[in-house]
Each structure stands twice: as structure tokens, then as C-alpha cells.
């Protein structure tokens, strides 16, 4: 039998830096300004409208 090793990157909220769990009602989208970076938002930051900043272009959103 073969052992299979799977590696994946856990998404992190762009606003607070918290790891996003699979059961959380989070969202992700492409930066509306540059279209290059993926912005992740955890449920808490979405509900509280915590600002976020694009890691590529620095654009800030609500």
C-alpha cells in the first residue's frame, strides 16, 4: 500500500489574520482594484465590516 501525503494551505483572513476553518461562513474574492490578489474574509470580520487591505496593491475596502 502507498502512503499519500497531501499538503494544502489554510486560508487566512486578510483583515484579522485568523485561520479560516472549513465550517466557517467565510468568503473570498479577487481584489476589485488590481484583480491579482485573493482576499479572504472570516465570518466575524464580514459581520463587523472590519476593513481589509489588498496585499498586492494596497487598496482598502470596507
From Swiss-Prot:
Keywords, alphabetical: Metal-binding, Zinc, Zinc-finger
Domain of life from the UniProt record: Archaea
Keyword Phosphoprotein among UniProt keywords: no
GO molecular function: zinc ion binding
Note accompanying the cofactor annotation: Binds 2 zinc ions per subunit.
Binding annotation for Zn(2+) 2: 31, 34, 54, 57
Residues annotated for Zn(2+) 1 binding in this entry: 13, 16, 42, 45
Pfam families for this protein: HVO_2753_ZBP
Keyword DNA damage found: no
InterPro entries membership: HVO_2753-like (IPR044720), HVO_2753-like_ZBP (IPR011668)
Entry cofactors: Zn(2+)
Complex and partners: Crystallized in association with 70S ribosomes.
Protein name, per record: Double zinc ribbon protein TK0111
Organism from which the protein derives: Thermococcus kodakarensis (strain ATCC BAA-918 / JCM 12380 / KOD1) (Pyrococcus kodakaraensis (strain KOD1))
Lineage of the organism: Archaea, Methanobacteriati, Methanobacteriota, Thermococci, Thermococcales
Amino acid at each position: 500500500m502507498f502512503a499519500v501525503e497531501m499538503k494544502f494551505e489554510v486560508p487566512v483572513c486578510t483583515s484579522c489574520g485568523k485561520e479560516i476553518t472549513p465550517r466557517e461562513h467565510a468568503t473570498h474574492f479577487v481584489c476589485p482594484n488590481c484583480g491579482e490578489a485573493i482576499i479572504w474574509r472570516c465570518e466575524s470580520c464580514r459581520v463587523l465590516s472590519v476593513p481589509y487591505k489588498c496585499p498586492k496593491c494596497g487598496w482598502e475596502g470596507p
